[in-house]
């Protein structure tokens, strides 16, 4: 009989809240399956077999979840214990034993010593374990393999993913849950077949989205070699029927990951969607499990009934897709507030659920902005830093990283004979030969599945530049482009002339060359590297080059540049000197495949493309129009660069450095990245900004214009939403938590440290103490993600959580942080907690933090947070007086106080109070101890810790010094008169008489 295959999709409740591979009971029809995971050396093989009838290939359905399939619901039920039986087919050695381990509350412990042993059954290579578990619980479990007996046994294999099982709340008396797994090796000979493992946890394949509906009852799982009859059930309000069937043939699916080089350890577990299999699951169909390598993996039989069945399944798959073709994240009410300013700083606040989560500040007059493109001049090469300094017109020269295997955009450009090189470095097109948007040829949409898999899976050649990570937190799975390829065609670069002048850049940072000394000269390094490898061979000091700002200057550091600009629009990211195709990981299923094909079709020669999340669901015409705008922008950039370079060669002053393309302002950037269908409204308080935003949306997203509101009330916008106080609290080091704990945030030059304090949230003993610590750490995890996003903290962040004894609690805290940072636009990476409770978080920094922009270093403490103690300043005053006494020729008679030296001491008000308080003041003690007279004066402009010590001079001494100065001036005047031959000018010093308070009229 025909087998009705139900397409699936991932439900929200099975999101990345756990790293487990979920094993959930299901009530919808599914073919018999056999799941195999076999280790051979350093390679894991994953095999899934579906029952197929009529000996025809079926549509490739990926394994998103391991399913426990149950039969129809029994009439009688009761609550209590349910027996769960694990039956595993495994080919083990004589001294090897299989165990089951799981959650401590259900299966005892995750530790190998406390694992539940599985015993061999009557059948060969079959192991069984029985456990009674309370009804209505959900628990995780896993398998492990031990070699040996007793205390001498060693764990030789422990897979990474953890499975999950939901036990129904009501249990039939004579029923039990049976879980069948097969770990038998299967040899499949196919050149075209690829093998994938659990080394990658992100889905990126030609896969249909799957749907799993939890079962409403507890029933027995089906075996891989038995026929079952499953009742009709509902999937997302769609009724799907099935008939009993007999398994006629097994179609094998396999996948592998070449990067998997080691077994999983206890500390290393999949961190993101571990139940997904990377890349495509290729369908293999032949009776003897052998496939011709030249056979199309998506070929189908000519049987019309079979084709109709596949088409129905495909239509149902598309119907079950979420809106937009990609997985929707948890919906949170988002509001964007824009507080405009004419002469100071424009403020943009992002509210999620009524709470301030992000604050963006943009000074009205900004010289350098991130993503702006300049024509700069190379001023100095720094081979030991792997880059060069470039003058782009800013106060400090900017650092540019160099990739020696990627050709830059320089003027004059590289030449190969009489041909100009294209944007990707091939001698095909000149700068003026970049295809216009309307000249792009569009390929046919007739494609095969195998070609889809090869769109972005070329052999990895050159690695992309370091700023490949997206600022809007769109993660991309794209393959490295192959050096020397133009959209898959091999071209000959030809010989590149080697320059004879100094200043050639030797190699990119991190390039390994054992024959080169680290202190070798640039010329020597250039000789070692071949011209084919070093595409910067003609670049030298004074070369004009197109660069883009990837990170704004911070403190004493100048901006960071890249020689390979990257232009962004609403739907695309255009990558220069690249041939890669990428799609946001937030898009999956059929929509992901469609966008891949469109991107490959529209890809301009010599450029790479990345599809952004917002592009999901948009038509080809909309995507092409958006890409045409990017190509036109790049053409304008190259034209401006050529004009500026020619003007500089003709001696025009100020021609370079030149701004070629100004980055989009903060306002429109937020509209582009944030403003979508999930945003409830955007409120602006300036008619000028309102017109700017609506004018931009008229072309990009007209349907969102009605969500833009103009605030014209008397109360300020931020006061209306009560966020001014939260902005004031950004400078505070201590952040209180809702449960009584607190965070202490310390920002240094190297990193940011965050300390979690328990405070009043700590109470109880034993288990209650551990529970209280967990609650504080979980609350801190959520607040930390909010604070680093709100303060725009970048770089390395080290979090010191309260120590926890339970490893599972550490896992919960780690998962909470991972979940909390998902909504951050910047790229955030989180490490697991260490033995000492430390977590390392890295966040991409593209601009100065909010704290840096709204504050400046303290003139007293110099940004250290501490000022000099008054006792220390008092000691310094004593040392300074002693230093000046040592320089004096006459120190006076110690027995005659009138002859003691006199000094004037100027201090701040705090130090003055410190010296003059008490019965016997510190000033008197200092004077009598050093045998000096001290005249104390308060300088109001002095900061704390500042003082000045000068010798005191009476009026007679001052007059004598003034007389000496006057005599020296007379001598200079006489000398000048003698040399010039003019009349002598005599200067007579006149002593000014004191005048009375009343002036005569």
Curated annotation (Swiss-Prot):
Tissue-wise expression: Expressed in cotyledons, rosette and cauline leaves.
Binding site for Mg(2+): 755, 800
Major place of residence: plastid
Keywords: Chloroplast, Coiled coil, Endonuclease, Hydrolase, Magnesium, Metal-binding, mRNA processing, Nuclease, Plastid, RNA-binding, Transit peptide, Zinc
Subcellular location: Plastid, Chloroplast stroma
GO terms for biological process, alphabetical: chloroplast mRNA processing; chloroplast organization; chloroplast rRNA processing
E.C. code: 3.1.26.-
Residues the entry annotates as binding Zn(2+): 858, 861
Coiled coil as UniProt keyword: yes
Any one GO MF annotation of this record: starch binding
PROSITE patterns (UniProt xref): CBM20
Cofactor(s) the record lists: Mg(2+); Zn(2+)
Domain CBM20 as annotated: residue spans: 76-185
The keyword Plastid is annotated on this UniProt entry: yes
Gene3D superfamilies found in the cross-reference section: Immunoglobulins, Nucleic acid-binding proteins, Ribonuclease E, catalytic domain
Any one Gene Ontology cellular component term annotated for this protein: chloroplast
Cofactor note: Binds 1 Mg(2+) ion per subunit.
Family (UniProt): Belongs to the RNase E/G family.
Biological role: Involved in intercistronic processing of primary transcripts from chloroplast operons. The endonucleolytic activity of the enzyme depends on the number of phosphates at the 5' end, is inhibited by structured RNA, and preferentially cleaves A/U-rich sequences.
NCBIfam families cross-referenced by the UniProt entry: RNaseEG
Subunit-level organization: Part of a chloroplastic degradosome-like complex. Interacts with RHON1. A homotetramer formed by a dimer of dimers.
Name used for this protein in its record: Ribonuclease E/G-like protein, chloroplastic
Organism: Arabidopsis thaliana
């Amino acid at each position: 009989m025909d087998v009705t295959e139900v397409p699936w999709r991932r439900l929200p409740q099975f999101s990345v809240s756990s790293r487990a591979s979920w094993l959930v009971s299901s009530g919808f029809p599914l073919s018999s399956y056999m799941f195999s995971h076999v280790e051979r050396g350093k390679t894991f093989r994953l095999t899934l077999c579906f029952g197929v009838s009529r000996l025809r290939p079926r549509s490739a359905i990926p394994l998103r979840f391991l399913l426990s399939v149950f039969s129809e619901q029994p009439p009688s039920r009761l609550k209590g214990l349910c027996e769960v039986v694990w039956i595993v087919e495994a080919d083990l050695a004589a001294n090897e034993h299989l165990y089951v381990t799981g959650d401590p509350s259900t299966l005892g412990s995750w530790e190998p010593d406390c694992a539940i042993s599985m015993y061999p059954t009557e059948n060969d290579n079959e192991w069984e374990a029985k456990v009674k578990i309370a009804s209505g619980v959900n628990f995780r479990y896993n398998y492990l393999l031990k070699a040996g007996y007793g205390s001498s046994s060693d764990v030789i294999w422990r897979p990474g993913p953890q499975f999950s099982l939901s036990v129904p709340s009501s249990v039939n008396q004579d029923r039990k849950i049976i879980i069948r797994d097969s770990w038998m090796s299967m040899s499949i000979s196919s050149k075209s077949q690829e093998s994938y493992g659990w080394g990658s946890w992100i889905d990126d394949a030609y896969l249909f989205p799957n749907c799993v509906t939890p079962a409403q009852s507890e029933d027995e799982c089906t075996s891989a070699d038995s026929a079952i009859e499953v009742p009709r059930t509902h999937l997302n309000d769609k009724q799907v029927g099935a008939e009993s069937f007999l398994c006629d043939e097994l179609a094998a699916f396999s996948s592998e990951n070449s990067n998997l080089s080691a077994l999983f350890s206890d500390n290393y577990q999949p961190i993101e969607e571990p139940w997904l299999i990377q890349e495509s699951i290729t369908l293999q169909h032949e009776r003897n499990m052998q496939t011709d390598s030249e056979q199309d993996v998506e070929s189908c039989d000519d049987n019309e009934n079979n084709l109709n069945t596949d088409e129905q399944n495909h239509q149902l798959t598309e119907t079950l897709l979420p809106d937009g073709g990609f997985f929707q994240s948890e919906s949170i009410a988002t509001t964007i507030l824009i507080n405009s300013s004419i002469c100071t700083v424009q403020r943009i606040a992002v509210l999620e659920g009524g709470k301030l989560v992000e604050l963006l500040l943009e000074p009205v007059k900004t010289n350098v902005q991130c993503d702006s493109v300049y024509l700069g001049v190379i001023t100095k090469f720094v081979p030991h830093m792997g880059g060069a300094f470039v003058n782009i017109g800013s106060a400090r020269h900017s650092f540019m990283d160099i990739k020696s295997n990627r050709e830059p955009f320089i003027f004059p450009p590289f030449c190969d004979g009489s041909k100009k090189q294209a944007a990707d470095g091939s001698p095909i097109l000149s700068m003026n030969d970049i295809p216009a948007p309307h000249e792009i040829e569009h390929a046919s949409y007739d494609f095969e599945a195998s070609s889809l898999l090869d769109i972005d899976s070329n052999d990895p050649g050159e690695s992309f530049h370091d700023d490949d990570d997206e600022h809007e937190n769109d993660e991309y799975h794209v393959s490295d482009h192959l050096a020397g390829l133009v959209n898959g065609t091999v071209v000959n670069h030809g010989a590149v002339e080697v320059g004879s002048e100094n200043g050639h850049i030797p190699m990119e940072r991190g390039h390994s060359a054992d024959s080169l000394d680290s202190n070798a000269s640039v010329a020597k390094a250039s000789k070692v590297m071949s011209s084919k490898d070093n595409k910067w061979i003609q670049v030298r000091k004074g070369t004009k080059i197109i660069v883009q700002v990837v990170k704004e200057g911070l403190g004493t550091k100048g901006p960071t540049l890249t020689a390979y600009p990257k232009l962004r629009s609403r739907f695309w990211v255009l990558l220069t000197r690249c041939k890669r195709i990428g799609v946001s990981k937030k898009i999956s299923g059929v929509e992901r495949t469609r966008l891949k094909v469109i991107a490959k079709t529209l890809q301009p020669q010599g450029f790479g493309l990345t599809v952004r999340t917002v592009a999901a669901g948009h038509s080809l015409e909309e995507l092409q129009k958006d890409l045409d705008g990017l190509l036109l922008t790049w053409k304008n950039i190259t034209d401006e660069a050529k004009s500026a370079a020619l003007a500089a060669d003709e001696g025009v002053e100020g021609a370079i450095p030149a701004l070629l393309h100004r980055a989009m302002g903060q306002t429109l950037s937020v509209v582009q990245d944030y403003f979508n269908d999930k945003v409830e409204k955007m409120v602006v308080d300036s008619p000028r900004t309102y017109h700017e935003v609506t004018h931009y949306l008229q072309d990009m997203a007209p349907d969102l214009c009605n969500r833009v509101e103009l605030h014209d009330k008397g109360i300020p916008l931020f006061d209306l939403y009560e966020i001014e106080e939260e902005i004031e609290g950004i400078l505070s080091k201590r952040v209180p938590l809702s449960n009584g704990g607190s965070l202490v945030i310390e920002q240094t030059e190297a990193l940011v440290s965050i300390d979690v304090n328990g405070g009043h949230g700590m109470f109880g003993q034993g288990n209650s103490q551990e529970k209280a610590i967990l609650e504080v750490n979980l609350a801190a995890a959520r607040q930390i993600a909010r604070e680093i996003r709100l303060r725009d903290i970048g770089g390395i962040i080290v979090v010191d959580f309260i120590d926890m004894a339970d490893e599972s609690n550490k896992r919960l805290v780690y998962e909470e942080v991972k979940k909390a940072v998902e909504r951050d636009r910047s790229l955030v990476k989180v490490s697991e907690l260490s033995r000492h409770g430390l977590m390392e978080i890295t966040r991409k920094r593209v601009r100065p933090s909010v704290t840096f922009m709204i504050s400046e270093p303290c003139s007293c403490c110099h940004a250290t947070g501490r000022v000099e103690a008054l006792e220390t300043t008092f000691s310094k005053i004593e040392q300074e007086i002693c230093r000046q006494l040592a320089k004096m020729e006459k120190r006076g008679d110690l027995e005659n106080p009138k002859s003691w030296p006199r000094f004037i001491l100027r201090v701040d008000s705090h130090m003055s109070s410190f010296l003059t308080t008490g019965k016997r003041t510190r000033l008197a003690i200092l004077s009598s101890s050093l045998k000096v007279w001290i005249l104390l004066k308060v300088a109001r402009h002095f900061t704390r810790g500042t003082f000045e010590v000068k010798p005191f001079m009476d009026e007679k001494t001052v007059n004598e010094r003034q007389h000496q100065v006057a005599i020296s001036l007379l001598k200079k005047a006489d000398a000048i008169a003698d040399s010039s031959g003019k009349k002598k000018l005599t200067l007579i010093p006149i002593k000014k008489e004191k005048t009375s308070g009343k002036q005569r009229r």
